[in-house]
Curated annotation (Swiss-Prot):
Modified-residue entries (Phosphoserine), positions: S321
Name this protein carries in UniProt: Nucleolar protein 56
Impact reported for V333A: Reduced growth rate at all temperatures
Sequence segments annotated as region (Disordered): 439-504
Family: Belongs to the NOP5/NOP56 family.
Record text on subunit structure and interactions: Interacts with NOP1 and NOP58. Component of the ribosomal small subunit (SSU) processome composed of at least 40 protein subunits and snoRNA U3.
Signal peptide range in chain numbering: none
GO biological process, one term: rRNA modification
Chain's gene name: NOP56
Additional remark text: Present with 13500 molecules/cell in log phase SD medium.
Amino acid sequence: MAPIEYLLFEEPTGYAVFKVKLQQDDIGSRLKEVQEQINDFGAFTKLIELVSFAPFKGAAEALENANDISEGLVSESLKAILDLNLPKASSKKKNITLAISDKNLGPSIKEEFPYVDCISNELAQDLIRGVRLHGEKLFKGLQSGDLERAQLGLGHAYSRAKVKFSVQKNDNHIIQAIALLDQLDKDINTFAMRVKEWYGWHFPELAKLVPDNYTFAKLVLFIKDKASLNDDSLHDLAALLNEDSGIAQRVIDNARISMGQDISETDMENVCVFAQRVASLADYRRQLYDYLCEKMHTVAPNLSELIGEVIGARLISHAGSLTNLSKQAASTVQILGAEKALFRALKTKGNTPKYGLIYHSGFISKASAKNKGRISRYLANKCSMASRIDNYSEEPSNVFGSVLKKQVEQRLEFYNTGKPTLKNELAIQEAMELYNKDKPAAEVEETKEKESSKKRKLEDDDEEKKEKKEKKSKKEKKEKKEKKDKKEKKDKKEKKDKKKKSKD
């Protein structure tokens, strides 16, 4: 491998380019002596030399460059410093080697500078570690603690941009919750089947009498040894079976004539421990479902009202976030979750799928076979609208979702009976009225007061203008009258003077 000639170091305050003076032909460059030299500042300065340091103009530029580097892109700032400080390729020397910390940045630099070969091997990482260790001494003009503060500020800004933290619209928890809910459903089903099979050796008839997994696990914990069941257990059994004394009595009767074998206390103890795990997982699954519903009503109330909390959460999870879902067209929302079928249909030139995740909605199951595609298209359109309202409204409310749901129900009825549906304009007007109605009385009163004060101000301005106009007109009339009087006096005087002259 070619020796390293230059080193690129990305600081939170700017980019630095170093020239590597280490004679890498020596076998020592591959031994511990190099790492020891790196730890000593005096010895490390003999290995590298600062060529140029280009500071960022501000925190915004630093964050922009950090985002570019994380995505493996060459920013304009990085391109400029490399262009100015790396020697151009010549006939004698065609390529230049540059040590970088992130190997994903290499292809982008190679694309911009074809004569630069990027290296991120162990030696390159050791040299970069040395620069990071002695940064305050290498970059002149920096005070103690400046680099740490810059790193902290940039780290917070970068993390905030990545997480996109928002108390009201933190949809990341929804994505994690729905993924965990799906996993729990699979695990509970698998574990419950194992409990049924295991306990079935002792009491095989119970599985047919009680098909529900959670109830079965609870009964296993209560019954344990089937021989302990008697008529006194009827009341407690009925409590576990939703007060169904008929099934409880059948359980007791079957326990007396059961074909199952007896099992030891140790085996029964293990069965009960596993049944307890299934019951606790089922309890946690219920808590998680309640949490998901609550979170969906906070983050995406209209989408939840329209299509349900679970399907809405699946749509958000599949899109990546509520913002991504709101940016997608209704046709994309319609087939979310059916990508494999879509690409298979495009490849074989067959019929594309009509629905994806929204297939599990009650609206599509209610529609007839010929109307399933039509209602799925209409429902996807309303889901797209609901997600946009949820994402961009400052105070999300479920009133728009309830009106959109009403429209979908009416459209479903229209396909069956031909009854006309509510128009979009009227539906939105109705939703806006409900939205304003739901606002607190104080807020509505404040809005009314603002409107009335604005109206009063306009009326006062009109009156003031009217008064000014009247004053102006009076003044003009007065001036005209004065001019007329002056003219009349002048005319009389002139006539008098003429008569006097004629007599003389």
